[in-house]
Curated annotation (Swiss-Prot):
Keyword set, alphabetical order: ATP-binding, Cell inner membrane, Cell membrane, Cytoplasm, Membrane, Metal-binding, Nucleotide-binding, Protein transport, Translocase, Translocation, Transport, Zinc
Name by which UniProt lists this protein: Protein translocase subunit SecA
PROSITE patterns in alphabetical order: SECA, SECA_MOTOR_DEAD
Originating organism: Psychrobacter cryohalolentis (strain ATCC BAA-1226 / DSM 17306 / VKM B-2378 / K5)
Pfam families the UniProt entry points to: P-loop_SecA, SEC-C, SecA_DEAD, SecA_PP_bind, SecA_SW
Amino acid sequence: MLSKIIGSVVGTKNERELKRMRKVVSKINAYEAAIQALSDEQLQQKTEEFKARHQGGESLDALLPEAFAICREASLRVNGMRHYDVQLIGGITLHEGKIAEMKTGEGKTLMGTLAMYLNAISGKGVHLVTVNDYLAARDAELNRPLFGFLGMTVGVIYSQQPPQEKVDAYQADITYGTNNEYGFDYLRDNMVFSLKEKKQRPLNFCIIDEIDSILIDEARTPLIISGQAEDSSRMYALINTIIPVLIRSKDEEANKNNEEEDFWIDEKNRQIEISEKGYEKIERFLIQVGELGENESLYSPSRLPLLAHVQAAIRAHHVFVKNIHYIVDDGEVVIVDENTGRTMPGRRWSEGLHQAVEAKENVEIQAENQTLATTTFQNFFRLYDKLSGMTGTADTEAAEFKSTYDLDVIVIPTHEPIARVDMDDQIFLTKLGKYKGIIREIQEIQAKGAPVLVGTATIEASEELSYLLDQEGVKHNVLNAKQHEREAEIIAQAGSPKSVTIATNMAGRGTDIILGGNWQSFIEDIDAVSPEEMARLKAQWQIKHDQVVAAGGLHIIGSERHESRRIDNQLRGRAGRQGDPGMSRFFLSLEDDLMRIFAGDRVVNMMRAMGLKEDEAIEHKMVSKSIENAQGKVESRDFDARKNLLKYDDVANDQRKVIYGQRDDLLAEMDLLEAIKIMHQEVYNAMINQFIPPGSIDDQWNVDGLEDELENEFKIAMPINDWLDEDRRLDEEGLRAKIIETALDRYHSRREQMGEKDAAQLERHFMLQSLDKHWKEHLTQMDQLRKGIHLRGYAQKNPEQEYKRESFELFQMMLGAIKSETVQDLSRVHIPTKEELEALEIQQRENAAHMQMQFEHSDIDNMDGGVERAAVQSRNVVGGATGASVAGAMAGSSDDADPYAGMNISRNAPCPCGSALKYKQCHGKI
């Protein structure tokens, strides 16, 4: 109440910001007359002038008014489009590192060019992020003439892009690409073996288009690069056969505590719980098929993977539904994005869920994966020096944008007042009754001559509605994940008179629906269009446009409410662009998931008590309020889940920064000798401590054990007993110093044999190999720790604090293991010739380039082991972090692959690699 009173007196924060920015707009407009008088050549020269002024110390803020005025004039000359004042305000918002909420059809694409041009003047690069490759390529081509006229280069990044082409795209002044590709390129850049292989420049300025979709809807989406793990396809197929005989509880809440059923489902969180009866039934089956011993249970530590298979299979059968959560296309299970209705080819759920769905659908079961590198969108985009974004719907999530990303949301006024009318929801008893109501509404709208866009939440709902419309003889188009190839064509004509388009959620988002249809799409199909033909087509379109406007514009029908108000607002926002008329209304039923799971019993009982017929609807404020409360609960739950994920990922992110920083140092540092010396001292000290404890007397020393360990681990023979016999005054400190000095002397001697350059190359390869190997293992350990950490709460411990403590301990152990393995490898290495070094480096790159990896996402991570990931597969990853490396091929201890496996070598013979070890102790080691 107090904030409202203060706001009415001094204005809201948004109003104050707009007032400040309008003063800047006045400065921009003051340049217009003088700039209009410039020739094209003079206008183009301004970019070089701005660059010189900026290098001379003038800030981008100071350049903004004139630079925006130049960009606006250039846009008018090149594209025939002049930025409105509200678009200038949006450009200022983006430049200041804020989020511009601009309604659909108000020109976000054109608005973004202002901030992109200004920030490209610094020469540090600007990244424009879109939700899919089509929009990235479309917007790049749309704006390339403008930026080219102004002397700015434009690049586009995409998956499977040739390496040099991608480097060139990142070197451009302005780069377009998807959030996935930027994130995966960041991870790939931190898996390369030389700085020359890196693609990205330091992350400078980023504008995210549809920022709510990327930083809110996909915030719980870890980006994961993974390699293949062991094949468990047989197990998934086996487990799949038992699921149909398990009995699901009919009333989840009422039966949660009885043992009559085998399992029940928490629909809100998409989790399953198995009863004791269910466990016994599953165990009996597994014992019968020989997968479980007579005295074993699913709770046995060694059998926990089996339990995970079972849980994944139950979720696949009873939580994940075909044509809602996924489709089967050409023998593959393809995930459907629930927020957009688009398919996500190549992405895969993790934790065995995707394999379980493949078994359920009886298609080929693909292998699971092991994580090699990972980050989240939340942490990746926070790496940019300046982050901004634009969308039509951000204000409802303003608090989350501020708390998570420190981003303010500025609501940009519309150029023309919004003429769309948003009608009250209509609520029906059943889904069929709701569909009948929707069809009646469509027929009434069609009779007026207006177009209709029907938004559905799932593919299944779109096909059900399509079937019913066919029965009624209503011509229509369907746009869902199965018809994505025709998306642009369908959306282009969705504003034509009497057209009916059914679309899953926000399919087609990013493309405006023009009243009367898009007349320019007809021209694209004609090779050469005469001016007369163009005028005729435009006149025909104008007649249709006027007809649709007279009929009330585009009518939006929502077939159910989404869990998020923001998604509902996005659907409404498809109508009423730039002052056009329009209407929107949502149709609901008590059988809708949102109503069934979240709406209160009071609402349901009230509607049933009214004795409504199936196809009769009510409009009531109490029902609308109940729906809003349900959506608020879901949004709050999702916000908490994202906030919880960030707490845990921040721990991993700090470790990631350390590892990636060390990797960059290794790649950039020419001389690693000093670091190698320190490693030797630390590793040898740690080993000595095991046999000669600090502060101990000589009776407590295990000298024989130390000699054996030095020989076994580092292949160095030290006559420590002889040293002690020769010098009785040699104490613990002196002995420690002598051992380390001897080890370093030996290493220096071997280093001189190799030569400075080759030695440095070998040291770098060993350190990179060890770092990558142990980081990969550490990620797996962190993942396992994270899945079970919530159980610490039952022991009255804080899971978050426990996670921080244990992850730090794991990190320290990993760093110790990297140092120990590096010193060990350098001590055991065969000194190669220059030719061997070159040949092995080529082999390393070839192995890395052909190594199959996966690029993954996770849709849900609520810290209880219920993680779902989606993966994008790549066939060629240059600079992979594993495979036979130079160091591994030469070291006795780095023998991931045996290059001599086919040579029939005796296990007691010397190893062919020249390490002076027996084959069974070197490359033939099992």
